[in-house]
Amino acid sequence: MSSGTPSTEPESSGRSAGMSTSPTSIPAGKGTTTPPKVTQQDVSVELKNMRPDRSPPKGSIPLGEDIMQIARIGEIGPMQRLFDEKKFTANYQDEEGITPLHWAAINNQYAMCKFLLDNGADVNAKGGDSVATPAMWAAQRCHYYIVHLLLQHGADPLLTDVQGYNILHLATIDGNAFLLVLLLHQEIPVDVIDQQGHTGLMWAAYKGYPACVDLFLRWGANVNAVDDGGLTPLHWALVKGSLPCVQKLIEYGADRFAKTRDGKSPATVAGEMNTTRVWYRALDECGYDVDGNTKVLPMGLTSWLRNKSVMSKFFFLWPFLMVYAAVYILSHMVIYAAIPIMLVATFGLQWVAQKAASQAPSEYRVLQKTPYLSGVFAGSLFWVGVTYIFSVLPATYSTSPILNILFAVFYCLTTYFYIYSMTEDPGFVPKTGSRNQQKVVINELFEQWKFDEENFCVFCMVRKPLRSKHCKRCSRCVAKHDHHCPWIDNCVGANNLRHFVLYIICLEIGIILFLQLTYRYINILPAPVEHACNIINEELCGFVLRDPFTLVLDLWIAIQLVWVTMLCAVQLVQISRNQTTYENMRGHSIDRSYPSSRAFASAITAGTTSLEAAGLSATGQGPNPALARGHSHRGRRHGCLQQWSSLLGIDTFFATARDGLRDGPRADRPKNPFSRGIITNCRDFWCDPAPYFGKREPGTAMLGGEIVNYNQMYEVPMRMYSDGRYQSVAHDDPEQHV
């Protein structure tokens, strides 16, 4: 919160209406005397309401002697004078028990908080209508750097306010996952309850925070805990109606038939809260019918469709049949009938795959998230190989031996690099071995003012190296993340980027060679004795009917040549820039938003010209650089055309072209801190000592002629480090860019 904006004190009851455990009603009010019923209206369930009219009492006290106002705006100089003149102490309390530390904490005045603590302020003093500690005030504004400072100085995280909420409950209600990560590493019991038996998981489920629900469940929270009214987290999630929360709870084994004290099951709650549609969909996504029972499929298919290994193989091999069926129908039937029959057959086979996906494990419910697309390529590659071995090779080897040898070499190379790119670890950032190690990492990031979404992953619980990104498909952070490619069903990162580039280059060359070979092959074949075509002329008809299957297959792979060429061009340009696809699409930048002049101004605002005392980094970065920035969980809707544009890499191609043709001086363009010039960038990529055929050391690569490890790169190389710092591009999520 800006120091120039009047702050507010948490009010004791304004945010408590809505969550209750009365056995006679669906949860309604927390801490209220007579719990109201939850209606279908938007019942705001907040613990503390911060009204803008609440601020430290002003009266006629001059600003220079108003200790509360001085604490609020963070003026250390005047505060020091008050202490020197013995007018106040750091433990001064007003008539409500509020201390200067409360006001400094809620206004994110890090330097003032540290100053007060160093002067003996009681870190656990309770005050205000809510009888809360400074740490609680800070937690309700998600000022987790302040919370960390107070915890370091002895703040007790298990203290409760007048309504029985501790700091974990307050942090959960505001939904900040980073604050929860900090608190859970303070040995706070994950299932600690409030006065009415609500756990943090219940609050997260009620508020509809999927990231917080996931965090609590991964931390070991009891998914079937019950409060004083007998409600479980699943009941609370259905009150809010958040599909991701409900689905996550069911996946973790929530009791689908648990009843409250007044006999209400989750289904009953869903009906009363008008969230039945969410309830049914979550059940379906997790493999249950509308009654909550496990779906039973005919012919014993249930066990097969629920088996991830079996379904992975099915989705990969099914397109082999689809490609063959489409090519066969188009090549063996009259064109008027072939096209509609081929479309019906193709969509029919795809419908089977989609129905199988609807009963598969939850991560396979969307066809694009399965190995289906990689199977399309593998099937095409397989039938090209079969056609070449049994048709093209015998007819052309004697007349075109060199061309055949070249094609065979590039076909084998394409297959090898494809399989390697698909099966190799793309560069997953190693996870820490224990929670104690996680805590050490978190403390180190706090010391460096880097505990934020750009430097720490709340899913993997690891420090994110530069150029890394968390892949939702792989559920891991990937070093030097390029993109998640559905055509290889794997991420492309530090370990397999070169193999991926070699794969598409060999594919490009292989397609061109095969087209030349099949042209020579068709010319060698004798023309059919009798032939009749409905559309094309007689001469072309005779040419096509010599081997229609091979020609249709040629047409299919020629279409693939278009997007493969664009993909090759994009990757080669990015290699010359030492840039990944993700960086290309989201922008490489040095963060110059906090130059030295702003650092100085911030230090003055904090009441000191010392960067250290003001809680600023050497580059002027404040102690809370990204805390006010919210994170949207609302996914973008993409049309069919845009989805295929992403899948085929067309959007990346045009983005690269626009960047190359952009007007304006180069000095105005975002700087790439990893570029060493075109020649050096290309040499680093292609002359990397890692083997072309075999695994490389995880995370290693060359940068400026030196071996670096992207698994452990947390600082920009000094050669490019000036007055700014590198800022990773972890804002949007183009998971399907190729």
UniProtKB/Swiss-Prot annotation:
Its EC number is 2.3.1.225. It is found in: Early endosome membrane; Golgi apparatus membrane. SUPFAM superfamilies: Ankyrin repeat. It catalyses: L-cysteinyl-[protein] + hexadecanoyl-CoA = S-hexadecanoyl-L-cysteinyl-[protein] + CoA. Its main location: membrane. Residues 1-314, 358-372, 423-498, 570-738 are cytoplasmic. This is Palmitoyltransferase akr1. It comes from Aspergillus fumigatus (strain ATCC MYA-4609 / CBS 101355 / FGSC A1100 / Af293).
